[in-house]
Amino acid sequence: MNQSSFTREELLACSRGEMFGPGNSKLPAPNMLMMDRIIEINEDGGSAGKGFIHAELDINPDLWFFDCHFKGDPVMPGCLGLDAMWQLLGFHLAWSGGPGRGRALGVGEVKFTGQILPEHKKVSYFIDMTRVIKRKLFMGVGNGRVEVDGREIYTAKDLKVGLFTDTSTF
């Protein structure tokens, strides 16, 4: 796929299975879709020259997780930021032609050094692909960081996602 950026409407189409074809990777539907747009995606950028993704999520106080996490102390769950990075890694694999359904396979290290609150405006996700395997199993490995309003608050090393044409034994 030659397209290098995606709107929210296009990401929603991906969540419905309308982007990469039947049986292939989808993004989650709302409320679990953790980005509003992909600003840039490529196959040869990033720190390792294996690919790069930059995406954003607009923050507003009405987002579903602020009402339940936590009452009187609203904060976006850190695991949602981690999931967003896995979502983007899987999207990159499908965008680069990988067949199958995306599944998170792990992460080497995650650090949280800040939080996302209702008064913040924008979350930015950055993924540097460090390894892309295109064999029987399509698998991507990458390092990610999350920023809120321009300040780095999460980092993740060795995020792993695979694409599976058969998930019955996974």
From Swiss-Prot:
Keyword Nuclease assigned: no
Any single GO BP term: unsaturated fatty acid biosynthetic process
Alphabetically ordered keywords of this record: Cytoplasm, Fatty acid biosynthesis, Fatty acid metabolism, Isomerase, Lipid biosynthesis, Lipid metabolism, Lyase
Subcellular location: Cytoplasm
Pfam family name, one: FabA
Gene Ontology, cellular component aspect: cytoplasm
Pathway assigned to this chain's UniProt record: Lipid metabolism; fatty acid biosynthesis
Matching Gene3D superfamilies: Hotdog Thioesterase
Function comment: Necessary for the introduction of cis unsaturation into fatty acids. Catalyzes the dehydration of (3R)-3-hydroxydecanoyl-ACP to E-(2)-decenoyl-ACP and then its isomerization to Z-(3)-decenoyl-ACP. Can catalyze the dehydratase reaction for beta-hydroxyacyl-ACPs with saturated chain lengths up to 16:0, being most active on intermediate chain length.
The protein's assembly and partners: Homodimer.
Protein name per Swiss-Prot or TrEMBL: 3-hydroxydecanoyl-[acyl-carrier-protein] dehydratase
Organism per entry: Idiomarina loihiensis (strain ATCC BAA-735 / DSM 15497 / L2-TR)
Organism classification: Bacteria, Pseudomonadati, Pseudomonadota, Gammaproteobacteria, Alteromonadales
